[in-house]
Amino acid sequence: MNINYPAEYEIGDIVFTCIGAALFGQISAASNCWSNHVGIIIGHNGEDFLVAESRVPLSTITTLSRFIKRSSNQRYAIKRLDAGLTERQKQRIVEQVPSRLRKLYHTGFKYESSRQFCSKFVFDIYKEALCIPVGEIETFGELLNSNPNAKLTFWKFWFLGSIPWERKTVTPASLWHHPGLVLIHAEGVETPQPELTEAV
């Protein structure tokens, strides 16, 4: 049975959710954003959309409904490049996925690593497929010093006593706030951007 959604989703759409685990809660606090997990739609299996994601322990493909169910209170939002994607661009995005699957999750969120984490996974797919940065690479110093809500004691504990201030990373928040993305639909998100009134 085909699952119906409130909007028409497409390959390349970025799915934002909120994982309730403690680590991901600290990611939200550090980046001052409701979302702490992202994936990317890469197709449809005849019943549901398929989402590629980097998660613990390995990057994989799941269905959109399962992806949403893992979110706290099933909150989610979907964004798309404001200009939309051509069929060739969608194909290029899909072509980037296989080589990135079954990669270990990097719990230290180091961008310059062979391991994956969710925002790096989506950021790199767009960068390699379309030469479009849909987020921002920043250091932990820039991230944590820019937000008074960040709990440094947690991150010192997480990094075994010493925060790697110069380590580069990319956060779900930087994707969420990227000006080139427009909101297609949101469920349970308190302050979403205005939804599109016209087709992209």
UniProtKB/Swiss-Prot annotation:
Pfam families: Peptidase_C92. It comes from the Bacteria. NCBIfam families: PRK11470.1. To E.coli YiiX. This is Uncharacterized protein YebB. It comes from Escherichia coli (strain K12). The lineage of its organism: Bacteria, Pseudomonadati, Pseudomonadota, Gammaproteobacteria, Enterobacterales. The gene is yebB.
